[in-house]
Each structure stands twice: as structure tokens, then as C-alpha cells.
Amino acid sequence: METLLHSEILKKYKEETNEYIKKKNVEKLFDIILKNVLINKPDNIYLYIYNNIYSFLLNKIFIMGPPVLKITSMLSSHISEFFNYYHISLPILIQQYKLNKGESSNNKIIVNDEIISFILKENIHNLDSKKKKGYIVEGYPNNNLQAYSCLKYLPSHVFVLYADEEYIYKKYEEENDIAIFSYTQKKDYDINEPHEINNIDVKPLKDQVLSYIRNISDMLTILGTNKKVLNLHDFNDQMLIDHVKNEVSKNKDEWDSTLNGDI
């Protein structure tokens, strides 16, 4: 009789414990804590966890897309406003850094990956993780080194907005109400080849676009299963916003039961 009673008590205890573990997301919580500790290797592990536990649970969203186009900024703004998340615009932060360093037309400031990493880390560190449930990083990552660094933040989502050269140039012209290229059919490759038609220096534009095209394949490999590739040919602006909203909504409340007091 005692053995049977003990068995029933033990069974009930296991059921309640498993239910608690599932409801409070305990396994994922400890997995995230462990990963953050191993990535950052703090001297005082207890203080590190105590001071940063809320930041571990933020919905961390990175959005990178074609240079010179407005789509990445527009999407980041809409998502941050809709979910009331922090919005970190890396292009703006880099521009502010250059201005603070006294950049001018005769004095160009080079911002390397180390500086970009520092700027981003500092801004994320300064967020009040108790006030909002997540943040959006606009315009990151942009190359292989940045992709590796991005993974260290244990991102919830990395949205990669993909477009080919022709799309980027045509969209740029549309957004800026300007015609700087003509598109003629190239028979050998059956693609449209842009040719300059105005006396405008488009070299900086072309350099940025070519850098994006050159880096994106390797970045996608590095990001692995963490990224979601969205081909801009398949979306208009509103469709893109709605799609990303739906993706972010899937896990926006996943830590509510962990942080709430009810059992």
C-alpha cells in the first residue's frame, strides 16, 4: 500500500514538474544563460547573470538589406513601432560617429568592423531591458566578420532582404525620382546591364551595391538556420511588413510565463 501510494505521489510530482518546466520555459532559459556565459566569459558569473538576465530574454531582431535603398530603414521603423521595440539604426550611428570625429569632404573617416562592433555593442548594452521586450538592429550584418559577431548576440531573427543589381538600381531611381541608368539586354548572359546615362558620379553607389552582392552569399552560409531570406522581388512594401510582423509575433511573448509570478 505504501509502495503504491509512494508511486502515485512520485508520478504526480513528475507530472507537475514537467508541466512547470514546459510552462516556464525552464530548459530554454538555462540554455540561453549558458550560451551567454560561454560567449562572454565573465569573471564573476553570478553578477553577470544577475545584471543581464532581462537582456538575455529580449527579442533580438537584425535586419539587413540592399544598400542605398530605403526599404531596410522603413521596415525596421515599422516593426519597432508596432511591437514597441528599441530601434538601433547602425547607418545613423556610423554617420554620427564620423561627424563626431570631424569628417568632412576633405577628411573622410574610415569606420572598420572593429569600430562598428564597438558602436553596436555599446548601444545594445545601454538599453533598458526592463522597459521593452526587444530591439531591432537596422543594417547589420554586412559582411562575414559582422555575421559571426551577429551570432554572438544569439539573435531571435535575422531577416536578410535580398535583391539583385537590376532591382536595386531601378528601385533607387524610383525612390529618388532620377534616371541614372539605361537597361539594355546583354545577349551573352540574357541579363539587363546598367549603363550610366547622366553625368552623375555613380561609382560610390556601384561600389556599395557590388559589396552587398559580393558578401551576401558567404553571409548566408555563416548565419545558417538563424536567417530568413526575403527576396524583394516577391514582396511589395506592405506585404514585406506584414510578413515580418507575422514572423516576429511567433515568439514575442515566449518569456511572459517565465517572468510572470503565477505558476
From Swiss-Prot:
InterPro entries: P-loop_NTPase (IPR027417). The keyword Metal-binding does not apply. Lacks adenylate kinase activity. The gene is AKLP2. It is found in: Cytoplasm. One of its GO terms (cellular component) is mitochondrial matrix. Keywords: Cytoplasm. The keyword Hydrolase does not apply. GO terms for biological process: AMP metabolic process; nucleoside triphosphate biosynthetic process. Belongs to the adenylate kinase family. One of its GO terms (molecular function) is nucleoside triphosphate adenylate kinase activity. This is Inactive adenylate kinase.
